[in-house]
Amino acid sequence: MKVKTRFAPSPTGNLHIGSIRTALYSWLFARHYHGKFILRIEDTDFERFDSKSVESILYGLKWLGLNWDEGPYFQSKRLERYKEVIKMMLESGNAYKCFCSVKELEDERIRQVSKGKKPRYSGICRNLHYRNYIANENYVVRFKNPISGQVTFEDKIRGKITFQNEELDDLVIQRSNGIPTYNFCVVIDDLDMNITHVIRGEDHINNTPRQINILKSLNAKIPIYAHVSMIFNEDGHKFSKRQDALNILEYCKDGFLPEALLNYVIRLGWSCGNQEIFSISEMKELFDLRKISKSSSAVSMKKLFWLNKYYINNLPLSYISNLLKDHMNHEKINLKNGPDLESVLTLLKNRHHTLKEIAQSSRYFYEEFANFDKSAADEYLIPENHFILKNLYKNIKKISIWSNETLSSLIKNDCIKLKITLRKISMLLRVVLTGNIFSPSISSVIFLIGKEKTLLRLKKAILFIDNKIKNINN
């Protein structure tokens, strides 16, 4: 059997982390068995259809590297095929037209609830051979579900699941406007596309027996089902693709790596011993539906940040640097005005969790800052440090060999001569060169900023203290 899986999102909102997991599991299963992965866009909900969501889905999957072998197929382009099957089912007696009005159905529901019964369609139109109605009378088409027996399927994650047919409604498979419903379209799509394994969220479990019965009525082969548990956000609520902000595009914009996100997502329900870090090739080799937990998962941004930092520090420098360029451009930082980006990345990558953070924290290497941080200036740019800065300016100006080692020795020697701590002079230089008190090794910062810019910023700080002294004297 040639394995064939599918990812079938609805373009009605953002592609969120739960959707990404479904896509990843389906993709990995197909790749593990050297099968095919199909992309299908379920766009028959015309009222909520959002073309930007389609763009987001396609971009997100490409960014993650989840390439598809067929598609994208659009349900909206297959309407004639669905109607053809519905017509065939009407003729064979496996479906029927239901003329009950919305009011009739609501009255029926109220009566059932008042009697303590489970609301369901009574089947009043199920066996009608004719009815006096005007030509344009509205109707829906319902699937004639078996009224006895049971539906049993072996879920690859949850084991055997059984539903009694008497508990299942006669499903509407075509709306009154002539548009087929989701639960019908998905069955015909899976049938026509020869899908062998359906991997999806547990919220689809109740749809499965209805879909199986439709397939049986068509004498079709039943695919293998695997329903993964829900993912909850950090507040303990179910993710909503129309409410949660962190959709796939936001992860990308915020500087997360696709490798980190995939590694994070695969562990939301799947495990392989105590291993935490998985390359894409390892995921494809090790992925097994039997290792997916039945329990729900909860997102942890702390864990995702940790993984992202790991990949920033362990993937090839040239690869990370190339990705970082996009974030530098977004921050409008001109790379021509400063040091080699890979050198800056080497210095900063262990201090930050995302590419966006690295880009934002690297600005002082490429452009002058307008003002010193006020609290930092109040603490360090003070009259008693005036001489220290003038001495540093004089000594740095004399340097003929510009190297990290030379700068480090100069700073240490000044500490000895001036009888000040290395911490004090380092913090002072951080404020002078970056505008605040946070930076990597100060000698490395000076080296990358360069001699000319270092002297200019030292002069700026000296003048700042000069003005402060004048104000005190006045």
Swiss-Prot record:
Instruction: Look up keyword Nucleotide-binding and say if it applies.
Output: yes
Q: What's one Pfam family the UniProt record gives for this protein?
A: tRNA-synt_1c
Principal localization reads cytoplasm
Catalyzed reactions per annotation = tRNA(Glu) + L-glutamate + ATP = L-glutamyl-tRNA(Glu) + AMP + diphosphate
Keywords linked to the UniProt accession: Aminoacyl-tRNA synthetase, ATP-binding, Cytoplasm, Ligase, Nucleotide-binding, Protein biosynthesis
Which cell locations does it reside in? Answer: Cytoplasm
Is Nucleotide-binding tagged as a keyword? Answer: yes
UniProt xrefs under InterPro entries:
aa-tRNA-synth_I_cd-bd, aa-tRNA-synth_I_codon-bd_sub2, aa_tRNA-synth_I_cd-bd_sf, Glu-tRNA-ligase_bac/mito, Glu/Gln-tRNA-synth, Glu/Gln-tRNA-synth_Ib_cat-dom, GluQ/Sye, GluRS_core
> Which EC main class describes this enzyme?
ligase
Residues that coordinate or bind ATP? 241
Its EC number(s): 6.1.1.17
Q: Which domain of life is it from?
A: Bacteria
Coiled-coil intervals: none
HAMAP family xref list:
Glu_tRNA_synth_type1 (MF_00022)
Q: How does it assemble?
A: Monomer.
User: What role is this protein assigned?
Assistant: Catalyzes the attachment of glutamate to tRNA(Glu) in a two-step reaction: glutamate is first activated by ATP to form Glu-AMP and then transferred to the acceptor end of tRNA(Glu).
Q: Which family does the UniProt entry place this protein in?
A: Belongs to the class-I aminoacyl-tRNA synthetase family. Glutamate--tRNA ligase type 1 subfamily.
Recorded protein name is Glutamate--tRNA ligase
Q: Which species is this record about?
A: Buchnera aphidicola subsp. Schizaphis graminum (strain Sg)
Q: What is the lineage of its organism?
A: Bacteria, Pseudomonadati, Pseudomonadota, Gammaproteobacteria, Enterobacterales
In the UniProt record, what gene is named as encoding this protein? gltX
